[in-house]
Regions:
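Helix-rich effector regions associated with P-loop NTPase G domains
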Residues: 1-29, 37-38, 43-45, 50-56, ...
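Structural beta-sheet core signal
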Residues: 32, 58-60, 130
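Short, glycine/charged-enriched secondary-structure capping and boundary segments
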Residues: 45-48, 72-75, 102-104, 143-145, ...
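Canonical P-loop GTPase G-domain recognition
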Residues: 64-131, 150, 254-256
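Conserved active-site beta-strand-loop modules that form the wall/rim of enzyme catalytic pockets
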Residues: 92, 142, 172-175
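Alpha-helical scaffold segments in soluble metabolic enzymes
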Residues: 100, 104, 140, 213, ...
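Short, structured loop/turn "capping" segments at alpha-beta junctions
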Residues: 112-116, 143, 149-155, 221-226
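Glycine-rich phosphate-binding P-loop
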Residues: 127-147, 177
Length: 287
């Protein structure tokens, strides 16, 4: 399905990009948080360039929103393509696998510690930078790691107080950075996936188009029955014109404006919210 190209790169993101680049020399490990539903679309190519000489850990957050088979595929993909030293699936929301993340950080930083000890330095600090796109769950992850609400947490993309150093424990410090995207997406699909999952503010998006793209993907993946059951649709409602399906969702679920016209926008938001909250099944969008 074609649509207007999606792009969102406000001025503060350029400043954050410069901040990340400038501080990279202070860092031992780069922990990049990606969305398990769109691991490739949510991986910032700029970070790959900046962190090429650093130890890299990719964290697949929101892993409870996709099937285990997809997680295994992407863990293997990132390792085989030399995109990370370690890859771990977590859920910052539930706390799943947070303890395992500590172990991975210790494992990845062990080489530096051994080198420093060989030089006679007993006290060795490991510095970790946490990066990721907006609304990927970085702040919640940091709260889980630190064990308290030291990082501001928002449920809208773009919420963060700026660069923050956080001491996790003796010998381990963490640099939190605001979520950023990149100036030009590699394809229309990358922008669409970011929009569907909430990495770009809904207010600036053609929300009906985004919802139609999601519906189209679900039909392509063989998930029509989920849509049918969730929104009281009939087999006859299935159409190659996806906008007509959105209209049927509004009709079957009695979504009307004050003038008794179909509220297509309400239907569009409903479909997107349901996907983001895993009410349409566990599946990713990077295929």
């Amino acid at each position: 399905m074609s649509m207007t190209k999606i792009n969102w790169y406000p001025g503060h993101m350029k400043k954050t990009k410069d901040l990340i680049k400038e501080n990279m020399q202070l860092i031992d490990i780069v922990l990049e948080v990606v969305d398990a539903r769109i691991p490739l679309s949510s991986k910032n190519p700029d970070i790959t360039v900046f962190a090429k000489n650093k130890k890299r850990v990719i964290v697949l957050n929101k892993s409870d929103l996709v099937e285990k088979s997809e997680i295994l595929y992407w863990k293997k993909y990132f390792k085989e393509n030399n995109m990370a030293d370690e890859v771990l699936e977590i859920s910052a929301e539930t706390g799943f696998n947070i303890r395992a993340l500590y172990s991975i950080i210790d494992k990845v930083s062990a080489e530096k510690k051994e080198k420093m000890k060989a030089k006679g330095l007993r006290k060795v600090n490991t510095r970790l930078m946490v990066v990721g796109i907006p609304n990927v769950g970085k702040s919640r992850l940091i709260n889980r790691i630190v064990g308290k609400s030291s990082a501001g947490v928002g449920n809208k993309p773009g919420f963060n107080r700026g660069k923050q150093w956080v001491r996790i424990k003796e010998g381990l410090e963490l640099l939190d950075t605001p979520g950023i995207l990149w100036p030009k997406f590699e394809s229309d699909e990358v922008g669409q996936n970011l929009a569907i999952t909430g990495a770009i503010r809904d207010e600036i998006l053609p929300i009906e188009d985004i919802s139609c793209i999601l519906i189209s993907k679900m039909i392509k993946y063989g998930l029509w029955d989920i849509l049918k059951e969730r929104y009281k649709l009939l087999d006859e409602d299935k159409s190659e014109v996806i906008g007509e399906i959105l209209e049927k969702i509004a009709l079957r679920n009695k979504m009307f404006n004050k003038g008794e016209n179909l509220n297509i926008q309400q239907a569009a938001y409903t479909v997107l919210r349901d996907y983001r909250n895993c009410r349409l099944g566990k599946f990713g969008l990077d295929k």
